Amino acid sequence: MEGTGEMREVGRETLHGGVVQSVSETDEYKEKTIDSEKDGQFRVQPRWRKFLAHVGPGALVAIGFLDPSNLETDMQAGADFKYELLWVILVGMVFALLIQTLAANLGVKTGRHLAELCREEYPHYVNIFLWIIAELAVISDDIPEVLGTAFAFNILLKIPVWAGVILTVFSTLLLLGVQRFGARKLEFIIAAFMFTMAACFFGELSYLRPSAGEVVKGMFVPSLQGKGAAANAIALFGAIITPYNLFLHSALVLSRKTPRSDKSIRAACRYFLIECSLAFIVAFLINVSVVVVAGSICNANNLSPADANTCGDLTLQSTPLLLRNVLGRSSSVVYAVALLASGQSTTISCTFAGQVIMQGFLDMKMKNWVRNLITRVIAIAPSLIVSIVSGPSGAGKLIILSSMILSFELPFALIPLLKFCNSSKKVGPLKESIYTVVIAWILSFALIVVNTYFLVWTYVDWLVHNNLPKYANGLISVVVFALMAAYLVAVVYLTFRKDTVATYVPVPERAQAQVEAGGTPVVDASAADEDQPAPYRKDLADASM
């Protein structure tokens, strides 16, 4: 480690895949990465401590799997189709783990997050298009948070849902303000409430004792029987795999200090994979328990007429019905508090994801409260209109619709991610396994085909059964099919366009750049990377968790 003490902070430092901002001083680096060095003996940091240093990004992403949109789609799937759609959750979670791992790896290997790489690679007009799609994804995901929080206020304060929608503006700003006094403490409280809700569903599950054979069949035997099964499956998939999480995860890993050697980068990728897997397993079990509880109660033979009516139009407002065996009369209060925590925690991740997207695509940043206010006001408009016109039932349908929209927006974040992960111009020799990439591409195109087929089938079915004049149907068809064609053209463009911008910097070139900058030439540039301060993103170091 000789000579490193003379180094000072530099404005821009070369990293695998390009340039990152602000490297901390070497003294600070040594203090945080070395346990002790006495009498010439260097003690290596234990692996468990290295792993704990990487905990956080996957957990924050996994919290999004417990948001109001997931709860709503899980309950609807269970109430309408019992255990038939459990396989969608299994496939969705495996796919989510795969692509979120790719997103984390991309950030670690390149020193940039996905939105920044898109800005550097694509023409300006393409970036504007991708930015708009990404922002729409954030807004689409914020709508369920608005309605979930409004339902929580409705249960706790006995106010109309539309009034709760208006209150969500102030509640979220208050939460962001409180976060300034201790983000980790706030997140711990939110996580405690959410795991309380998870414990309630697990307890209800043990009380109901569903048929293990039926649950296993629903999880491993794909089936889409019955009217609305395809729509529910797409909504389930969209609620699990959200586009903004790809941008968020690739940015969160940059707040950790990762040395620049290939060995250290691969080790960091392994730690992030383990952390993400553990968080996703917990989220998977909770989602399965919600579906099974809803399916067991709403499809029971001894269901009362009142409960049957509730299950026929199950919303977040009527969910306490599913927990009464465990919590009794207190089920409403406990569930409402947990639902409130769920909506608020996901709002925080949405806000930070929005910051990452705006900074990456447009190279601009705004204060968290301003960013949250803009997103929330836009999300409130449809939520308020639907809750006034259609009440709780319409609000529940809007949550399902927003999840379906997320599924259609996913390819515009997913395709650039898959291309960059396997591009030698972006990650050099650190490309992903060919098997991983092939599986990811197959699943991605299967999703695109299913989405397109469902959209065409739904529109044709509506066209056949509506009572509009022929000229009106003709005009609408022209617009709809033009949008479908534009959607497919955009997907094809992103898929087959070759990467042109090289951001990966090989080791010899990095060593030469160091010499040209006035540094000391080294014999083994790769080994020298181990001794240098680990560059990291100070602009992302204040990320939640």
Swiss-Prot record:
Protein's cellular compartments: Cell membrane
UniProt KW keywords: Cell membrane, Ion transport, Membrane, Transmembrane, Transmembrane helix, Transport
Knockout-associated phenotype: No visible phenotype under normal growth condition, but after exposure to Al, decreased levels of Al in root-cell sap, increased Al content in the cell wall and increased inhibition of root growth.
Protein name: Metal transporter NRAT1
Protein family per UniProt: Belongs to the NRAMP (TC 2.A.55) family.
Residue numbers spanned by region Disordered: 516-545
Bilayer disposition of the protein: Multi-pass membrane protein
GO cellular component, one term: plasma membrane
Organism: Oryza sativa subsp. japonica
Function field: Metal transporter that transports the trivalent cation aluminum (Al(3+)), but does not seem to transport divalent cations such as iron (Fe(2+)), manganese (Mg(2+)) or Cadmium (Cd(2+)). Involved in Al tolerance by taking up Al in root cells, where it is detoxified by chelation with organic acid anions and sequestration into the vacuoles.
InterPro entries documented for this protein: NRAMP_fam
Coiled coil: none
Basic and acidic residues bias spans: 536-545
Induction of expression: By Al in roots. Positively regulated by ART1.
Main location: membrane
Keyword Iron (UniProt): no
TM stretches of this protein: 51-71, 84-104, 128-148, 155-175, 188-208, 234-254, 278-298, 333-353, 373-395, 398-418, 437-457, 474-494
A GO molecular-function annotation: metal ion transmembrane transporter activity
Disulphide-bonded residues: none
GO biological process terms on file: aluminum cation transport; iron ion transmembrane transport; manganese ion transport; response to aluminum ion
Tissue specificity remark: Expressed at low levels in roots.
